[in-house]
């Protein structure tokens, strides 16, 4: 059993390494951002499930239930892979707040379902910015299992974007990609 002093020494080493990793990004650090986004996304999906109103709210709530279960599975799978790679995970609310780039919105409870769907699309799209960066870093570091998991997550997110966009009557990338002026 570790003494309090040994625990503190390990924790301070973790904090120091996290600071280094976030100033010179590593695959592990970038995937920490991915985990934080998944955690924030879970809270937002739950909030939407609790407050969805409208003519098709039961179908929407069922969809959210599925997305929540998948989100939990993805978060656990990502955590396990990082542990397999010898990484230290973000686990506290403070870390998720610091590393997450999805924004929480307490007003979601008042939104209609199309606004909630648009928010989910934006979140999956934002999450993919970090996932794509994690893929590049993992490949550069030759951490191929991490890269493979992130490629899988990218595909999952893209599929969710397409499905949600179709619920709004839009094509998969409609309104999401910046237009090239050339």
Pin down the residues of each PLM region.
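Iron-associated oxidoreductase/ferritin-like identity signal
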Residues: 1-182
């Amino acid at each position: 059993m570790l003494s309090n002093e040994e625990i503190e020494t390990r924790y301070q080493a973790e904090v120091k390494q996290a600071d280094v990793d976030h100033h010179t990004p590593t695959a592990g650090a970038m995937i920490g951002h991915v985990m934080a986004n998944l955690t924030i996304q879970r809270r937002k999906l739950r909030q939407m499930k609790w407050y969805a109103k409208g003519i098709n709210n039961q179908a929407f709530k069922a969809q959210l239930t599925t997305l929540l279960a998948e989100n939990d599975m993805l978060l656990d799978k990502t955590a396990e892979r990082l542990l397999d790679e010898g990484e230290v995970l973000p686990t506290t609310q403070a870390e998720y707040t610091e590393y997450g780039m999805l924004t929480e919105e307490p007003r979601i409870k008042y939104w209609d379902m199309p606004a909630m769907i648009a928010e989910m699309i934006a979140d999956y799209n934002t999450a993919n910015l970090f996932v794509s960066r994690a893929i590049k870093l993992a490949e550069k570091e030759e951490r191929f299992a991490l890269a493979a998991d992130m490629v899988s997550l990218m595909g999952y997110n893209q599929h969710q974007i397409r499905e949600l966009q179709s619920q709004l009557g839009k094509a998969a990338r409609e309104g999401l990609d910046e237009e090239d002026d050339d």
